[in-house]
Amino acid sequence: MAQRAFPNPYADYNKSLAENYFDSTGRLTPEFSHRLTNKIRELLQQMERGLKSADPQDGTGYTGWAGIAVLYLHLHNVFGDPAYLQMAHSYVKHSLNCLSRRSITFLCGDAGPLAVAAVLYHKMNSGKQAEDCITRLIHLNKIDPHVPNEMLYGRIGYIFALLFVNKNFGEEKIPQSHIQQICETILTSGEKLSRKRNFTTKSPLMYEWYQEYYVGAAHGLAGIYYYLMQPSLHVSQGKLHSLVKPSVDFVCQLKFPSGNYPSCLDDTRDLLVHWCHGAPGVIYMLIQAYKVFKEEHYLCDAQQCADVIWQYGLLKKGYGLCHGAAGNAYAFLALYNLTQDAKYLYRACKFAEWCLDYGEHGCRTPDTPFSLFEGMAGTIYFLADLLVPTKAKFPAFEL
């Protein structure tokens, strides 16, 4: 872990240090808010210049145009500036011209551009275009019966797109029965693989991606179980306790002595502290398990995740969401919003302060340096989210 991160130069939480960032109610100080807002404007200009040389054919949420549309939609929600809505609209139109008709997910497939477009058309009172996008989104489910189950390329990533639409419309535009049907397929698929590979006694559910049993949020068990425990998926109490809980507990047993988690079941190397692999993604599963099952050990494990992230989360890979400081900071915000412990808000603010010096630490340049999940757009999204910490949610993942 240590080789992949910069040593954390910051003192940990104490009340007097925290007063520079937020007051006793958790409201950011005007000075810190001003610093964040100025940096957002500065990075937006840089990002817009950089996007001129981005791949014109990448319409995805993860590295392409739909991700930039998601950022501008978020900035419109935070600041209320109609110019941001227009920017989101122009980028999502670009993304709709790049649909692959292969993957069905929000981040790496056609569901992202269609879901974001539906929401934008709705906000712009273009009802017919919004309905057209929703119809196409619902029909995506028929593309590939052998689709995997994980977040980036699988059924969970499709479910996020459906929930994203319903949440932003404030009504059930996607029928609950459609979402339930996909959820049932995910459960059946997990039971089937668990039986086939003799995991049943340890974990009633099991999932793989490219013949690997991944553990983390992006491709693995933690991301899938985080969703299966969501109230909006309506998994029955019986199945939550007989299938999901023991499977979550199996993941908990994989914890390294450090408090971090492996990338795959058979990986004994304690290396990665990323949202995609390791504690910064597993923490969401643990927090949701604590909310659903009310057992203290899930909270303790989540707090251990936060300690690992504080120590090893300022990554040399950069400032992004998937494997960077901004994505890792969201873990602190999730724990802050669960516990109201000011220590976690302070830690998120310190990681934001690291991001305020964007480009000055000698980090690696990502393959797509201005994108939502690998690059600058994700950092901007995080800095804007931090302005109202109680509303902050990891984009395209957290519900």
Curated annotation (Swiss-Prot):
GO terms for cellular component: cytoplasm; plasma membrane. It is an enzyme of class 2 (transferase). It is a peripheral membrane protein. CDD domains: euk_LANCL. The modification N6-acetyllysine is found at residue 142. InterPro entries: 6hp_glycosidase-like_sf, LANC-like, LanC-like_prot_euk. It holds the Pfam family LANC_like. Strongly expressed in the brain, testis and skeletal muscle. Expressed in the neurons of the cerebellum, the germinal cells of the seminiferous tubules in testis, in liver hepoatocytes and in cardiac myocytes. It catalyses: RX + glutathione = an S-substituted glutathione + a halide anion + H(+); 1-chloro-2,4-dinitrobenzene + glutathione = 2,4-dinitrophenyl-S-glutathione + chloride + H(+). Functions as a glutathione transferase. Catalyzes conjugation of the glutathione (GSH) to artificial substrates 1-chloro-2,4-dinitrobenzene (CDNB) and p-nitrophenyl acetate. Mitigates neuronal oxidative stress during normal postnatal development and in response to oxidative stresses probably through GSH antioxidant defense mechanism. May play a role in EPS8 signaling. Binds glutathione. Interacts with the C-terminal of STOM. Interacts with the EPS8 SH3 domain. Interaction with EPS8 is inhibited by glutathione binding. Belongs to the LanC-like protein family. This is Glutathione S-transferase LANCL1. It comes from Rattus norvegicus (Rat). The lineage of its organism: Eukaryota, Metazoa, Chordata, Craniata, Vertebrata.
